[in-house]
C-alpha cells in the first residue's frame, strides 16, 4: 500500500500572503477567486476561520463547487469545543437563545460551564454547517487543537471519547501540553487514540520546556503533521504577535529530513497530510511547494 500525500497550507486568505503579492495574481480580487487558484496548486487546505466562528453552510457548498473533486478541506474546530475561552458573540443567535439565562449575560464561555445537552446541540450545528464537505467526500479531518494549559487527564480523555461518539469521519487531535507526550505517558496516550480511532497530530515547532516533541506516530490510517515553524525567540517572547511567531521559512534540508521520516510510515497508512502553518508572507506556500516536490506530488 502506498499512501496518498496531501500537502497544503493552513490558510489561503492570510493577510500577509495576499499583501506579499508573490503567489496570487493581482487580478484575483476576492477569497473565492483565490481559493480556485490555490486549488490549482495544492490538493488540500486547512480552514482556520472556523476556530473563531461557525462556518456558513452556504460557504461549504461554494467551497465544494470551486475546487477539484479530489481536493480536501480540513476544518479547525470551533474554539468552544477545545477548552478555549470563547466570546458569546461568536455563537450563532439560535444557540445563544438556548443557553441558560445566567450564561446569556456572560461575555465569554468555556465548555465546562455549559450543559452537556447544549454542547451537543452546538456540536451538531457546527457539523451541519460543514456537512456539504462530508457529503461530497471533501472533508479531510476536523482538527481539535487543545490549548497549552490542558494537561493529560482522565477528564480530557473522556471528553475526546465523547467527541468520537458524536462525530463521523477523521478527528485529528493536536496536544500542546507536553504531559501528553512525555516518555511516561505517550504509550498510554497512543493506545487510547488507537482504541478511539482518533488521529494523533504531530507538530514541528520550537523545542522549549513547555512545547511538545515532534514524535511521528500514526494512530489511524492517517498520518498528520502540522508545521508551525521554529522561530524560537518569538515563541519565548511574551505577547509576541501571531505573525511573528510563525515567521519561519524552513530550509530544504529540514524538509528533506521530514520527507524521509514520513516516507518510512507510508506503507502503514492510507493518507499523509503535511500542513504548513508558518503563515507569514509566502513562507507556508514556498515550503508546501518544496514539500510537494520532495514527496513527488
Where are these regions (language model features)?
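Residues lining hydrophobic/aromatic ligand-binding pockets adjacent to catalytic sites
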Residues: 1-297
